[in-house]
């Protein structure tokens, strides 16, 4: 179990960095590298790019779902592995963006978390906190042998 969790964490981290790089290129192409808040940026996005971005988000969720499905045995394991990998992906996505372009500048910076089905907007501390909490809970459950 620990080996699977470790490998899924590595997968989530690598995927987060790849996605962070894509977002940096997208922001550069659209002239939005210096934007303080993604909430402001979304209003400047051409509709075509919003649809492309939504397809990227859907592909991300599909990849996380598929890896959890392939690695997990029971339905509970599949769900736990999805949440685990998602948490690492989300946490390290923000870390990757910060390393690459120093964004977000603060934990209180407002971000567009997802566009599907409608824009989810919140300060970045919220998804970071949820991810850290998810990782801690799953780690504790794994260490005490719950799954």
Stretch-by-stretch model annotation:
Residues 5-10, 136-147:
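Sequence termini and other peripheral, non-core segments
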Residues 13-28:
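Alpha-helical transmembrane segments of multi-pass membrane proteins
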Residues 2-12, 73-88:
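Interfacial segments of alpha-helical transmembrane regions
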Residues 53-76:
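Cytoplasmic juxtamembrane interface segments
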Residues 21, 59, 91, 95:
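Active-site His/Glu-centered metal-binding helix of metallohydrolases
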Residues 27-58, 97-133:
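Functional transmembrane or membrane-interface alpha-helices that line membrane-embedded catalytic
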Residues 16-17, 85-94:
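Aromatic-anchored segments of alpha-helical transmembrane domains
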Residues 61-68, 127-143:
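Hydrophobic core of alpha-helical transmembrane segments in multi-pass integral membrane proteins
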